Amino acid sequence: MARIGDGGDLLKCSFCGKSQKQVKKLIAGPGVYICDECIDLCNEIIEEELADADEVKLDELPKPAEIREFLENYVIGQDTAKRTLAVAVYNHYKRIQAGEKSRDSRTEPVELTKSNILMLGPTGCGKTYLAQTLAKMLNVPFAIADATALTEAGYVGEDVENILLKLIQAADYDVKRAETGIIYIDEVDKIARKSENPSITRDVSGEGVQQALLKILEGTQASVPPQGGRKHPHQEFIQIDTTNVLFIVAGAFAGLEKIVSDRVGKRGLGFGAEVRSKAEIDTQDHFAEVMPEDLIKFGLIPEFIGRLPVVASVTNLDKESLVKILSEPKNALVKQYTRLFEMDGVELEFTGDALDAIADQAIHRGTGARGLRAIMEEVLLPVMYDIPSRDDVAKVVVTKETVQDNVLPTIVPRKPSRPERRDKSA
């Protein structure tokens, strides 16, 4: 606290005029004093201005068609999932803005509840990438969590609050901004309970985690340890309201298709029922017909399913889609590796047959789009090792044989530069 001057006069705040006896603190500057009350007032004004600047106006919120169009630039296929996500995300942020307007006008209109999203589908089909691209477009904090690392409170492993800590960190510890972010929880199928019937023994990494996630999915005031985990019991907790946090929960749900198939197959019993061949049933998109009862049978608890009302399914990518993924999106792998070779002054070319062969290998390995980069790395490794040490290479051509038979890519040598002619008249 500032002290009494040499003349015995009390020091005063240069802004509000209060003496040092009327305030808790008086901070001195070069010929200026400011009290704690004026500092608090300044902070409030700054926070209000920042909040107004960060708030997305309703007319600026991209429409579902615009969201889908943006996703088309980065994600190939999965049209149904794109439409579902576009509508769900648009409605979510429209709901947030409606809540802010009702608070400002002090009216009590119809309360809009949150609709979290459940994404189903095989690995490597774009579930995570769709969520990442959405967050990028909306410019909101985005965090990815792995459900397999979570355990119920009191057991070895991560608490569910650690998911919220990742979101707060993604927002640079701006809690207000984090409260309108997106959290993507992957591998949620791995926390399904081990049997349909409730177990006598405690399932701390399955049903226990589902129970722990219920509150934050629905919306609650959560206490988050800023240093994470349970190793710092005396740390101050960060308070965050999850009411406006959008949760996208995803998993491969291997085996769910059989549960759906068994249920759908029962329709084919009795006179007049439609009878389908085994091949027709196998090729059917089972994930598109998933019902809550199927997810319960798989191992998700009814309360958990009830907090995920929007279901978006992704399908296996066919060969044509994989070839497009390699070359068409803005961040396509072919464009990425072409840029890497350009940095060494070398042109890179893939023949159409080579791209087909890469897609075939990804399908054979069962890794979907996620496996494309691994195949590209294997194919290009020998030339990526040699090219930086050579200055005689103009172009590298990757062919079908390069991919299928491990033949080295075709190397086109650089034409030697002609020596300059001397002018005889000189």
From Swiss-Prot:
CDD domains linked to this entry: RecA-like_ClpX (cd19497)
Q: Does the keyword Signal apply?
A: no
Please name the Pfam families in this protein's record: AAA_2, ClpB_D2-small, zf-C4_ClpX
Which residues does the annotation say bind Zn(2+)? 13, 16, 35, 38
Top-rank taxon: Bacteria
Q: Which residues bind ATP?
A: 122-129
Summary of the function given for this chain in its UniProt record: ATP-dependent specificity component of the Clp protease. It directs the protease to specific substrates. Can perform chaperone functions in the absence of ClpP.
Fetch the NCBIfam families from UniProt: clpX, PRK05342.1
> What protein is this chain from?
ATP-dependent Clp protease ATP-binding subunit ClpX
Q: Which organism is it from?
A: Mycobacterium sp. (strain KMS)
What gene name is listed for this protein?
A: clpX
